[in-house]
From Swiss-Prot:
Pfam assignment, any one: Ribosomal_S2
Record-linked InterPro entries: Ribosomal_uS2 (IPR001865), Ribosomal_uS2_bac/mit/plastid (IPR005706), Ribosomal_uS2_CS (IPR018130), Ribosomal_uS2_flav_dom_sf (IPR023591)
Name this protein carries in UniProt: Small ribosomal subunit protein uS2c
GO cellular component annotations of the record: chloroplast; mitochondrial small ribosomal subunit
Gene3D superfamilies: Glucose-6-phosphate isomerase like protein, domain 1, Helix hairpin bin
Upper taxonomic lineage: Eukaryota, Viridiplantae, Streptophyta, Embryophyta, Tracheophyta
Amino acid sequence: MTRRYWNINLEEMMDAGIHFGHGTRKWNPKMAPYISAKRKGIHIINLTRTARFLSEACDLVFDAASRGKQFLIVGTKNKAADSVAQAAIKARCHYVNKKWLGGMLTNWYTTETRLHKFRDLRTEQKTGRLKRLPKRDAAVLKRQISHLQTYLGGIKYMTGLPDIVIIVDQQEEYTALQECITLRIPTICLIDTNCDPDLADISIPANDDAIASIRLILNKLVFAICEGRSSYIRNS
């Protein structure tokens, strides 16, 4: 895999607060190599290590995108939800930003069935068929569409398992991470000082609570994906 320059700037990362970890009492000792100091009761993340792993992740997603691979971005906590949707839409990736439904990947047949139902209902809505139904029946179907849009809207165009999954918060999205591990789907994961760096294929040490931190990391990854997609289009 070719290494590229992704304009990852330490000062920019500091401004985004990427270096602020959790309180020193809430930490995973496995994170010791990624921590540079303690300050006012919190661990400070070593941004040089962050830059290195973020660069590796950008190389990986660029390479995958340049070969037409598909990505899923997962981040369901309120602070991350909007950034996840914006990043995914920009890079034409699938995303989950409301709630991870257990078995979404490991029980793909059920997920696929729900997606087919969702697509059929949306088609009926667009063609005006719902307007011809009795009010009560139409109301039931509209509620179903709304429910499916909330939980499956970000993956409505997904036709198979993703090739790479990007996870914004390891602890919040532990079920999603475990499903990826079970299916051997490569993962890129933001890890704060209370996380286990050994679970993901590429772990990026970073503050997973600050919106600015999440957004910066996602923006770098999305830029690399977009560059890879452009390369794929040029060469196909």
